[in-house]
């Protein structure tokens, strides 16, 4: 009953959930705006970056979901954007990531990113990721077009099949130069690839949030196996390549002494490729 208290609750809920609902109790939200922590950020290429994002919920359609964002950098004066449509063969209660997944997704993205942004567990535009231990000036304008199918089973096996076309244009302190006497500047790299990945985590359970789903218990072992093949001459792809990766995670408890989380990962790039297609460490220069 306190004046203005509902606005305090609204703001707190937006920051805790990281999304703003557009509905009411009587008319549940069909579109959520967010993540809130990506609306303002900063990086070497964009400078000040403003972004508006939104995603639909099962209140609009329990099978068909849309997600996207538009961002603008005030330093490079370029627009960045992403659009995604996902069809879930399972009826969802609120969001498509709810376990178990059985869906097909088409996405289109044009954005600026560093080579290691793909390893981040959070959104790369998270405002807290803007604070880094050193300047990250080696970045790329990346255009990705992807079609992905994901299937999860009750016994913990996840299968992912994906085809993707990527265009990588270096910018900032990053440049692609041929490794020969000519030292020719390469304006961009195009790849066309298909991948197959398996993830097996018996006994794993999740809690769903509006931004991601979080494992309830980290005691379940996780086994991963993936292979990606690149096709030269297909839809502009410039390189043949084969990348195989395997991984293992397991938590070990030592009574009252604590625990040890073990991560083991290995991979092989079987072809001669430019350095952006080589295996790289999962570096994160943010605090």
PLM features: what roles do these ranges have?
Residues 40, 100-108, 113-121, 128-137, ...:
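C-terminal outer-membrane beta-barrel translocator/porin domains of Gram-negative envelope proteins
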Residues 51, 65-67, 103-107, 158-162, ...:
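Residue-level detector of the transmembrane beta-barrel scaffold of outer-membrane proteins
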Residues 47-51, 78-84, 99-103, 142-146, ...:
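Transmembrane beta-barrel architecture of outer membranes
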Residues 71, 75-78, 83-84, 102, ...:
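Outer-membrane beta-barrel domain signature
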Residues 57, 69-73, 86-88, 107-111, ...:
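Outer-membrane beta-barrel pore domains and translocons
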Residues 1-73, 79-81, 87-96, 118-119, ...:
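Outer-membrane beta-barrel initiation region
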Residues 61-63, 99-101, 154-156, 220, ...:
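Strand-connecting loop/turn motifs
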